[in-house]
Curated annotation (Swiss-Prot):
Gene3D superfamilies registered for this protein in UniProt: SGNH hydrolase
GO MF annotation: an example: hydrolase activity, acting on ester bonds
Keywords tagged on the record: Glycoprotein, Hydrolase, Lipid degradation, Lipid metabolism, Secreted, Signal
Leading EC class: hydrolase
InterPro entries xref list: GDSL, GDSL_esterase/lipase, SGNH_hydro_sf, SGNH_plant_lipase-like
Domain of life: Eukaryota
GO BP field: lipid catabolic process
Listed EC numbers: 3.1.1.-
Name this protein carries in UniProt: GDSL esterase/lipase At5g08460
Pfam family for this entry, one: Lipase_GDSL
Amino acid sequence: MHDSEIFKFKDMMMMSCTVQTLVLVPWFLVVFVLAGGEDSSETTAMFPAMFVFGDSLVDNGNNNHLNSLARSNYLPYGIDFAGNQPTGRFSNGKTIVDFIGELLGLPEIPAFMDTVDGGVDILHGVNYASAAGGILEETGRHLGERFSMGRQVENFEKTLMEISRSMRKESVKEYMAKSLVVVSLGNNDYINNYLKPRLFLSSSIYDPTSFADLLLSNFTTHLLELYGKGFRKFVIAGVGPLGCIPDQLAAQAALPGECVEAVNEMAELFNNRLVSLVDRLNSDNKTASEAIFVYGNTYGAAVDILTNPFNYGFEVTDRGCCGVGRNRGEITCLPLAVPCAFRDRHVFWDAFHPTQAFNLIIALRAFNGSKSDCYPINLSQLSRL
C-alpha cells in the first residue's frame, strides 16, 4: 500500500476512533490490515480457523461456480482488491470477513467451491457464503443457483469429513471448539423475498412480525446444527438498515436524506429476535456451559456511519459508487461500468453492498468495539475464552 493511501485511511480511522464508539485499535494493526495482512501466516492466529456462513456481503467467490445471476466476477468489482481483479466479492475491495480474518491473524480463507477438488488449505477455515442465499430455501430463487443457509451447513459437512481425515478425533473436537463461526444471513430474505411481492407470496402470508418469527425459527434450527457439529464460538451478524441501501431508496422513491423506515423496522424486528436468541443460548444450561454466542450489531454501526458520515471520512451515503438510475441503485453495477473516482468517500459500492472503506470500519468495531457493537463481548475478547 502506498504511503498516501495509508495516511488517508489513518486520518479517517483516527477521527472515527475519537468521535464514535469504536475502541481505539493500535495503529500498527490498522496498517497491517490495510496492507493486506501479508504476514498473517507467520503470526499466531487468535483462532485456529474461521468458518463463514452468509450471503453476498461476505461471499468471496462461491457464486462464481454457480449458474446464477448473482455474480460479481467482472470489473469493476475488485478494482481495489489485490491485483485489481474481480474475485467474486461484491465490493470494490475486501469484505468485512476479509478484514476480520486479517485482524485475527488468519490467512485468506478459501471459498468452499474452490476446495471441492482438493489441493486447497482448509485447516484455517472455509467460506460457504453465497450471494442471493438466505435463511429460507426459496429466497433468491429468481436469481438462479445459490446456497441457502441449510445448504451451506450441508457443504460444511463435506469439509468436516476432509478435516477428520487429517486429524485425530480428539484433535478435531478441540479444533472445532476453538474455531470461530461467523454467520451473516437474513438480508436476502427481505430484499430478495419478502419485499418482492410479485415474485414471492411471503408478504401476503405473513405480516412483518410473523415473518421475523419464521426467519428466527429456521435460523435457530441451522445454528444449532452447527453447534451440534462441535462449534462453540459464534458471531451472528444482524441484518443491516436495508431501508437505506440504494436499491430500496430508488424502489421506494425515498426523499433526499431519508431512508425507507418501514423496511428498516422489518430489519429491526428480526434483529431484536437475534439478540433474544443470543441471550437465551448464553443462559441455557446446555449451550451456555460449552459455548458463547455473540451478536454483531451491524445495523447500529451502519446507522451510526450513515448519521455521522463525515466523522468516518464519508461524503456520499445515498447512492452507489457503481450503478444506474435513481440513487445509482435501480440497476446494480454492470460489467465494465465506470465507478466513481473517490470510492473511499462512498458508503455504498453498488445498489446493495458497501465499499471496502465501510467494511473496514465495521470489522474494526466488531474486533475491538463496545457492547453496542458486539454483544456481550467483542471478537478480541472472544478469542481469549
